[in-house]
């Protein structure tokens, strides 16, 4: 049952069922619809019924107002419909009684004219509610189907519903005739059972009198041509009311759906507005924090600029000095390498001269020995010749002394800490072994003394020795160049490390200065009452301490 309209429609059906009973009893005791057997139902009050909105909880005010409005309109329509139905029922009953009286009057007049010549008549029932032709009144009931005769037999067999009194013989004859002919004829499609029957029966008013045709109770009235017409104006009205109710219900559901959608959207918008307000508050707090951070960064930037103004100039000066020292070291080492090459070439030339002069010097020595053995007096005369050999030995000694001086100069040269890879080390590969020249010269002299004719072999050996020495010198030069390149890379790396350390030191200085200022500010804020206390000697300014730290770091890097 519909929770909204169910109770009202149920009352409406009760009103429709119970309307015929009280009205028929008040007007003459007859009933509609062929005299039904249902008991009369009490009429519902004509005022508006109590309206209870569906749903477990209280409805919103808009929906409650809409439902109350619709309920009041429905109750007004029900009241009007009930009054109109009562009026129509009274009109139909009066028309029926008027026609019944006219029929009785007409039958009485015909009875006076015909006298006793009239034929015997039987009860006749007519079904209404369709437009198909009706069988004539003269047709015997025995020729009718059983389906058509049975409803009228039931109606005629109820003596309480007949205003003319009991008719037991005619009812018995009708039932016997209908049962005897029910097997002969089948029900016709045109005579379908209806809801309302109007019947007329012939009764005898007294012994020996003509039978009188009397119209029974019912809602139908018969045209002069014998066609029954049903007057039903209530059902279309009820259908129209149902249509109106359905339309109102659809509109109510549509309004309810729209209201629920709007209510949901409003709730969502309220939630969204609350979220946006919270986000706006959080954004304001973040903005304030960022503003404080910006102020702090500005203060730190001012401090950093003040510290960097002096540090940059000092750092640039130190970098320039370092670059100049590196260039000077590279130039000095190139000059030393060139001098070493010149000395080695000069020594090679001296060795070649000694090699070719050794045989003559050996012959002179033998002659000198023979002369000394022969006469000791000749040794004094040989004395002035010794300076020639002494001059040669003095040249060799001078070359050796120059080489030794160059090596000592290399050892005594003060290299930087980051250029240790370029320091000269006298190893087996780098040390110039000048004894090889003299040993080779002595071996060549002995070989020449033994084989004086093999001069060509000596020349070849000398050339091979030159090639070997040249190769060794070239390898030494390549090694020195490699060490120079390595030293340059090391110097660049150390320079970058030094710059990174300087940047780290600057950052630490900035942080220390910031912390010092914050501590000073916090101390000033916390103890404003102790400003009058006499202070001790002021500490040295931070710039001097920082300068001393920078000098120490620069000295360590230079070392």
Curated annotation (Swiss-Prot):
Consequence of changing residue 73 to D = Decreased interaction with LMNA. Loss of ability to immobilize broken ends
Q: Main location per UniProt? A: nucleus
* Known outcome of mutating residue 487 to R: Loss of interaction with XRCC4
The effect of residue 89 to T/V is: Does not affect the interaction with LMNA
Q: Which residues form the IF rod domain?
A: 73-526
Q: Name one GO cellular component term.
A: nuclear inner membrane
Which GO terms fall under biological process for this protein? DNA double-strand break attachment to nuclear envelope; double-strand break repair via nonhomologous end joining; protein localization to site of double-strand break
Q: Impact of altering residue 65 to P/V?
A: Does not affect the interaction with LMNA
Name residues in a coiled coil. 85-117, 237-301, 455-501
Going by the UniProt record, its keywords in alphabetical order are:
Coiled coil, Intermediate filament, Membrane, Nucleus
Q: What is the effect of changing residue 509 to A?
A: Loss of interaction with XRCC4
List every stretch annotated LMNA binding: 65-116
UniProt cross-references to InterPro entries, sorted A to Z? IF_rod_dom
Q: Where is this chain's protein located in or outside the cell?
A: Nucleus; Nucleus, Nucleoplasm; Nucleus inner membrane; Nucleus matrix
Q: Which tissues does it occur in? A: Ubiquitously expressed.
Composition-biased stretches, type Basic and acidic residues, lie in: 550-559
Looking at the record, which segments are called XCCR4 binding. Required for localization to the double-strand breaks (DSBs)? 450-525
Q: What does this protein do?
A: Nuclear matrix protein involved in the immobilization of broken DNA ends and the suppression of chromosome translocation during DNA double-strand breaks (DSBs). Interacts with the nuclear lamina component LMNA, resulting in the formation of a nucleoskeleton that relocalizes to the DSB sites in a XRCC4-dependent manner and promotes the immobilization of the broken ends, thereby preventing chromosome translocation. Acts as a scaffold that allows the DNA repair protein XRCC4 and LMNA to assemble into a complex at the DSB sites.
According to its UniProt record, which protein family does this protein belong to?
Belongs to the intermediate filament family.
Q: What is this protein called?
A: Non-homologous end joining factor IFFO1
Could you tell me the gene encoding this protein? IFFO1
